[in-house]
């Protein structure tokens, strides 16, 4: 049987959750489908993280729709999978292929009007989409997929000059208002927990450097290649997102059995209460950074299984193409 041909499109400029989702998904799909991907030429980090067996089409940041249309016409795909709204609006509706979009962010009806199907990752988005979106609608949780640990806790503490006995509170994301790193930083300064270190990791950290002058127990790092090393370093994971459509990092922290402090938002409210996670409002006076009785927590994360979730998306493709389940 001829392999289903898929063209993914992600024309972002950085590397965060949406880009990781794409790389993970095409890693899985390359075993079963004929997969290619369209990315911006200048996004070297994304390009370097894409499976080397997958064909990459690189485009420049001008006249993107014209370039993408040419690639699609030449590739003759069965499925075009758009990631983020700027990719979705560059694809015109066609009777020659099906267009599906993953709503990594909040979606706009005008941008997704050409899509045949939409994947969302939480119930709030699903309810919103039922009112506005006319195509096929699917809800699919994200997954966890992490690299093996390559540097142990002792090595990293020494490298980062963290005192051996200090409790490490950590968060991984982006230094963007959405992620709430400013809230974590403010709260940590206010409470000033003894014998502890705050470690915040993500793109855009340079703008925060002036906020941690004279704070030897606060460390900011930029993008890192292996998050597993740092989850393994954390004693407690802290997430203060103002909003998310899901939240990769919270589920990743669960894989490391970390005690977790998190805000509540539309991306996690479907499932967060099923787990032993401390839900907090970072703007209130309640104490958050406790340093005593910190123990590992066992979570059942089977609902976020990588292979199961990717297989689910494969079935979505097949349903759009009218291919019956085996």
Give residue ranges: language-model regions.
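A charged, aromatic-enriched C-terminal amphipathic alpha-helix characteristic of glycosyltransferases
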Residues: 17, 293-326
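Aromatic "clamp/platform" in nucleotide-sugar-dependent glycosyltransferases that forms part
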Residues: 223, 242
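Short His-centered aromatic/hydrophobic patch
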Residues: 61-64, 82-88, 103
